[in-house]
Amino acid sequence: MDTGKFRRLCHFLADSGNGGECYHNFIPTFDDGYVDNFDIAAPVLKEFGLPGIFFISTAMIGRHFNTPAGNRMEVMSRAMIRELSMAGFAIGSHGHEHSYLIRMASIELSEQLKKSRDILENIIGKQVTELSYPFGKWDERVVAAARTAGFSRAFAVHGGSCMDPRMVIPRIPVSGERETYMEKAAVSLKRRPIVMETLNFLRTLLTPPCNL
């Protein structure tokens, strides 16, 4: 999704805000911590008065991801993450090493979750209570470990049966490459689920903040 489409989507979402107890119907959230979160997404969100949650894989801070297509995606620095937090955006964990949590032994799982949370709290000087499961994969063991590590809300991609729905908040993909992305967003807003948009390799995820 190019920046123009992202701006139009944010404009659309801002116009859909219903005020009252829920300032907006949806909160944009961003996985992986790419630099374009800081350079592009955050300024556009601020322009339209939209909130946002940025989920960071802490082992990758200041480094880069290599995508399957061979692209190098730079990850935000500590200073950038701190600045986002100071600007009023929420910071969450996307795991430490961006690995499948469901494949980890219990001890490693607990250590990875706690480490990521500790690193982020040290950077921003605030509590970090939200987690986005890497690759959207989870099971009840991962949910329990996340809760024990201090997370009170966790985001998947697709939902599922879980004892605590706050720990498996679903997200519905909407590809920005399709001409119908705005129509899909409109339908999703009426049904109040989560919408996912893509800005280059940036993953924008929108989720209702209320009644969770």
Predicted feature residues:
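Residue-level signal for pocket-adjacent positions within structured domains
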Residues: 56, 71, 96, 164-167
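Active-site-proximal loop/turn and secondary-structure-junction residues that shape catalytic pockets
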Residues: 58-60, 95-97, 137, 160
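Conserved SAM-binding loop
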Residues: 50, 54, 97-101, 121
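Glycine-enriched alpha-helix->loop->beta-strand junction motifs that scaffold or abut catalytic
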Residues: 48-51, 87-91, 147-153
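C-terminal active-site subregion of NodB/CE4 polysaccharide deacetylases
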Residues: 1-29, 34-40, 103-212
